[in-house]
Every structure is written in structure tokens, then in C-alpha cells.
Amino acid sequence: SPLEPVYPGDNATPEEMAQYAAELRRYINMLTRPRY
């Protein structure tokens, strides 16, 4: 199963936050995708 992305912290750079947001979206999509 996919691993939950780790929050980079309040001092993260905008690039790190964007990467985290993208990984989190992908993670949630994998969790909520219907399994046929």
C-alpha cells in the first residue's frame, strides 16, 4: 500500500510544500480509488 507522505514541517520551503501537497494528493487518490 502507498506510504503516507511526511509533512515537511512549518519551516519547509515552498518547493517542499508543493512536493508534499502533490504527494498527498496522489496518496489520497490511491486510497480512494475504487477497487474492482
UniProtKB/Swiss-Prot annotation:
GO terms for molecular function: neuropeptide hormone activity; neuropeptide Y receptor binding. GO terms for biological process: feeding behavior; neuropeptide signaling pathway. It holds the Pfam family Hormone_3. GO terms for cellular component: extracellular space. Its main location: secreted. The modification Tyrosine amide is found at residue 36. Gene3D superfamilies: 6.10.250.900. Keywords: Amidation, Hormone, Secreted. It is found in: Secreted. Belongs to the NPY family. Hormone secreted by pancreatic cells that acts as a regulator of pancreatic and gastrointestinal functions probably by signaling through the G protein-coupled receptor NPY4R2. This is Pancreatic polypeptide. The gene is PPY.
